[in-house]
A protein has these predicted regions:
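Compositionally biased terminal segments of proteins
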Residues: 1-211
Length: 211
C-alpha cells in the first residue's frame, strides 16, 4: 500500500488497481500456499512510481527487482510483488474487501484465471494448471462466462500439458497444497474437458481484450 500511495501522490489521485493472482485464490479457497502479491494497473505510466530505479520509496523497500515494459517485479525475502499492466477482462472482475483497514478491489476467481490464460496461456506453469482446476470445480459458471479469454492459447496450453508432462509433473507435485490436493493427470483431464467445450469461433471473435 505504500507504493500505491506513491501512485496516488505523484500520479493519479485515485488510481484504479486490483489485487489478484494465486494469493487471492488462496484467500478465497485455501487451496495452496502463495506468498507473492500481484497488483494489476491499467496505466503503464504507474510502473514508474513503483520501480526502484526511479522511485525512492520503492528502493527503500528493495533494490532487487526486474523491470519490463509490462511489469515491475520486486523481490523481497518473504516473496515477490508484481505490478502488472493489465485492464480487467471480466465485468466488473473484482469484489470490494477491507484489507489492513483499507478498501481493496480483490479480483474474482474467474478474473484471475482469465488473466492467466489470456496473458500467458501459451507458457503455462504447474501452478496455473492447479489454479485453473480449482476454479473449474468451484466456480464453473463464472468461468464459463469468461470463456472467450480462456481459449486464446487453448491449443498451445493443452499441447504443453501433454508434451511437457515430465517437466511439469514434479513441479506440480512440489506445490504446497492446503485444502485441495488433486493429481496432475486429474487436473490436466479436467482442464482439457472444460476448455474443449468452447467453440473455436469464440476465440476468433476476441482478438484482444476489451479496452
Amino acid at each position: 500500500l505504500t507504493l500505491i500511495d506513491e501512485i496516488r501522490i505523484h500520479g493519479t489521485a485515485n488510481p484504479f488497481w486490483t489485487f489478484g493472482g494465486g494469493t487471492v485464490l488462496m484467500l478465497r479457497y485455501g487451496h495452496r500456499m502463495s506468498k507473492d502479491i500481484d497488483i494489476f494497473v491499467p496505466n503503464p505510466q504507474h510502473l514508474g512510481y513503483v520501480n526502484p530505479r526511479i522511485s525512492d520509496a520503492a528502493s527503500d523497500i528493495t533494490t532487487d527487482y526486474e523491470e519490463h515494459a509490462e511489469f515491475v517485479k520486486l523481490v523481497l525475502p518473504d516473496g515477490e510483488i508484481d505490478f502488472v499492466v493489465s485492464r480487467n477482462l471480466t465485468t466488473p472482475g473484482f469484489d470490494e474487501w477491507t484489507l489492513m483497514d483499507h478498501p481493496v478491489k480483490v479480483e474474482t476467481a474467474a478474473e484471475i484465471v482469465a488473466k492467466k490464460m489470456w496473458h500467458r496461456g501459451d507458457r503455462p506453469t504447474a501452478r496455473d494448471l492447479f489454479d485453473l482446476s480449482l476454479v473449474i470445480e468451484r466456480e464453473p459458471d463464472s468461468l464459463m462466462a469468461a470463456g472467450e479469454f480462456l481459449i486464446r492459447h487453448r491449443e498451445t496450453f493443452l499441447r504443453i500439458l501433454d508434451e511437457h508432462r515430465d517437466f511439469l509433473l514434479p513441479r506440480f507435485n512440489d506445490i504446497r497444497t492446503l485444502g485441495y490436493a488433486p493429481s496432475f493427470d486429474y487436473c490436466a483431464g479436467l482442464a482439457t474437458e472444460f476448455l474443449r467445450q468452447f467453440p473455436k469461433s469464440a476465440a476468433d471473435r476476441r482478438s484482444r481484450p476489451r479496452p
